[in-house]
Amino acid sequence: MSYSNGNINCDIMPTISEDGVDNGGPIDEPSDRDNIEQLMMNMLEDRDKLQEQLENYKVQLENAGLRTKEVEKERDMMKRQFEVHTQNLPQELQTMTRELCLLKEQLLEKDEEIVELKAERNNTRLLLEHLECLVSRHERSLRMTVMKRQAQNHAGVSSEVEVLKALKSLFEHHKALDEKVRERLRVAMERVATLEEELSTKGDENSSLKARIATYAAEAEEAMASNAPINGSISSESANRLIEMQEALERMKTELANSLKQSTEITTRNAELEDQLTEDAREKHAAQESIVRLKNQICELDAQRTDQETRITTFESRFLTAQRESTCIRDLNDKLEHQLANKDAAVRLNEEKVHSLQERLELAEKQLAQSLKKAESLPSVEAELQQRMEALTAAEQKSVSAEERIQRLDRNIQELSAELERAVQRERMNEEHSQRLSSTVDKLLSESNDRLQLHLKERMQALDDKNRLTQQLDGTKKIYDQAERIKDRLQRDNESLRQEIEALRQQLYNARTAQFQSRMHAIPFTHAQNIVQQQPQASIAQQSAYQMYKQQPAQQYQTVGMRRPNKGRISALQDDPNKVQTLNEQEWDRLQQAHVLANVQQAFSSSPSLADVGQSTLPRPNTAVQHQQDDMMNSGMGMPSGMQGGMQGGMGGGQDAQMLASMLQDRLDAINTEIRLIQQEKHHAERVAEQLERSSREFYDDQGISTRSSPRASPQLDNMRQHKYNTLPANVSGDRRYDIYGNPQFVDDRMVRDLDYEPRRGYNQFDEMQYERDRMSPASSVASSTDGVLGGKKKRSNSSSGLKTLGRFFNKKKNSSSDLFKRNGDYSDGEQSGTEGNQKADYDRRKKKKHELLEEAMKARTPFALWNGPTVVAWLELWVGMPAWYVAACRANVKSGAIMSALSDQEIQKEIGISNPLHRLKLRLAIQEMVSLTSPSAPRTARLTLAFGDMNHEYIGNDWLPCLGLAQYRSAFMECLLDARMLEHLSKRDLRTHLRMVDTFHRTSLQYGIMCLKKVNYDKKVLADRRKACDNINTDLLVWSNERVQRWVEEIGLGVFSRNLVDSGIHGALIALDETFDASAFAYALQIGSQDVPNRQLLEKKFIGLVNDHRQQSDPHPRSGSSRKNDSIAKSYEFHLYT
């Protein structure tokens, strides 16, 4: 409308400016008229145009009215459709939300059911697996026992075998069912997850549709509310909006249809899931029923097994009773046979008597006939005959009674033989039955034992191979490094000796030229007087020096094999330059230099002319060397006075130059021999290195040269050399050796000599004098204070009474060196050439030195952490009693007590190679004991006898176990090196596995034996004295041995049964301390039959008297039996007492 008004204004408004009349000049009248006409014409034309436009607008209005009517009709129609569609929409949304809530609740319930089904399925699976394991484990044994037990009843065997087969098939069926159910559950869970995702998406779409419908409804309401006049633009906008609303309604229709379809699909899927869940529940119910049936079958099998076990126990008891009855019957049979033999002898005697009486009767009849013939009329003869006839009738009656007795005895013997045959038949049947039972049990046990032994052998073989390879590698490395050090040291010695030879040759040349010049010139008179005055002293000194010089090569080279003298600590310092020289070692170096200079100066100053010439020809030593020489000459080293006088007076004394030349020539010969020996040693070292490279995987042994941790090694300790795992004694040849595991090794003698090669130590007088002169270095340890000083005094430290006792122990050990030599022959040093007597003397000296090391360390109360390597090795060998291979491994790996005390159980196994846990326990307990003994802050222990080593593993195995009646375990105890300090630390597992003590009663016997040792404070002497005191008196039952109990049984008149106590584990401590061990248990151990009532009553009477006397003495306040039993059980480790 605004557009049409604008056009009207444009058409009506003239283009003539109205202000022109006022502003212009005067207008003429004709122009005014023309203008008016023109104006009228224009107005008419404008009116025509306006009418046309009005008609056009009327037409347009009519058209618009028609359009609006049509639009209103369409709007009404759309509104009715919208109302139709939206009329049921809120109810459907509510129903859909309720259905969604129900579906969610159902899904949660199904999830819970699924979780429960999973748990139950897992439980059933575990139960089935357990049942399968049980059946597979016991199938063979059950089948064998069933076949043996019911060999005649084939129906029972087949039924049980079928039960086993059915169980197996049931297991397989349930496995397959589990797999199927698991697969179905996985598929159903996947479908539920997808459906939940679809539901969430559809819910989002429904919410968006609801929002759109709400917006469209609001717009429609706004459109209906606004009934304002509608022009062309409004009608177009409403038309567009209606079109959009129609499209949106179409989309909503399609989306609602799709959502309905999806909801129907979801309901169908839920129905399917419910069906699957019901099927799973039915399968679960069936599985539970099968499990119940299996449980019932298992209970039946357990009942059958318990029934079989009870039957086996009853059979065993019957067998034992039958065995005891058979022994009793045998004893009765022996008695009856003995009585029968006596009766036979009596019958023979009676027969002989009857025969003699018949002979006498015949003689009497003959005499009677003769007498009747001679004197029939004599009454006295008749009376006499009458008496003789009466005697004969009495003899006949006696013979008849003897025959009757013989017949009765025959009948009794026949009855007893019949009873004996019946008893033998019963015994044979019992033996056959027990043999069948024992064969089945033995087969089962042997099969399991074979499997365990095979597995154990494989593990032990792998472990042994690993340990052997590591030890071979370590030993080879050490020997190779040692050979390299020997080679370097020999090269250095060779070079130094070559330089010394060159210097001596130069000095000899200078001496000879000086001698030649002295002969060319005259000798001054004043000098000759000095020669006359000093000649005797110089000659004596020269002779003594010459003798000493001559003795030195003899001392040095009298050893076998022409080996050069060992330099002891100096060679060790040359091998290892990192070691610190002490003050005494530095003085010893200076002393050697001064000794060489003194020898050369003494040789050069022997002639009178050489004193003057030597000052010009010989190079003077520096002042430091001169002071060292003066110190050596004046320090009182112990040189002979003649030698000192010769060295002091030789500067001005005269002597034949030939003596000087011979001395120098001897010195050169000795140096040449030194050079040859050094070359020989170098050759040995090279050959050893080559052989070690070739045989590094076949031969391993300890290095031949061992360094010392003390600053000065004594001669005995320097000569002590031991191969790491050599177990041969010193008097056995080196052709055959044994490795650590006892396997023989055949080694070439040449290789043994090369590996054992060590330059021996040659003692000259300067060595001994220096040892007397030197004081102990501050760096030396207390344990090595006895090394070096051969005759020096030792300081006695004030120690406690316990350590004084330890000193007496080691003094006592020194007196019994021969016994130690016999017992510890495996610990001897490496094989050396020489006689057997010299080897034993060297061994005794080495043992004495080890005892001195330990005694000195204990007297000085040196803490165990400060002990050095040799003292720790001596302690392991003499105190702990470890085998030679463990001692050698400790010598190679442990250099101090601190290292030893810091070793853990794993490090002991890895570094020292102790694989047996009881051996490691022995070492750890010994270390703890020594640390507590030597610690200054630790209190004194009351059980010092443990430390003395009196109850070592040899005493435990050879003496103590037989006294307990457990001699059958001696080999296991000796293999485990079990000593007294280990007894309280044994567990039940150690007794069963390592000591092979499976019998519960034997373990109980061992426990009460340990309690007896506790009561005597582990004192072997006290125990022996108490046993000796009660040897012939029935007192002190606590210390009775198994043999003493047997003698007591013989004393009470039951000697027939005493042999049954051998290896039974019955001793005095068990009888005295175990209150559950009564007379019936003792009779059972003695194998006295239950029908032998008199012997049982006798044993019970004597046993009660013996035990009551002891228990009244030991326990004045008796308690109840249960409390005493609990106290006895609650000891250091658990035992099941004998019942």
From Swiss-Prot:
Cellular component per GO, a single term: neuron projection
Chain coiled-coil ranges: 30-144, 172-298, 329-517, 655-701
UniProt region (Disordered), positions on chain: 700-720, 764-847
Domain SAM intervals: 867-933, 952-1016, 1040-1109
Matches recorded under InterPro entries: Liprin, Liprin-alpha_SAM_rpt_1, Liprin-alpha_SAM_rpt_2, Liprin-alpha_SAM_rpt_3, SAM, SAM/pointed_sf
Gene3D superfamilies: Transcription Factor, Ets-1 (1.10.150.50)
Keywords for the protein's UniProt record, in alphabetical order: Coiled coil, Repeat, Synapse
GO biological process terms held by the UniProt record: anterograde synaptic vesicle transport; axo-dendritic transport; egg-laying behavior; locomotion; locomotory behavior; neuromuscular synaptic transmission; positive regulation of anterograde synaptic vesicle transport; positive regulation of presynapse assembly
Name of the protein described by the UniProt record: Liprin-alpha
Species in which this protein is naturally found: Caenorhabditis elegans
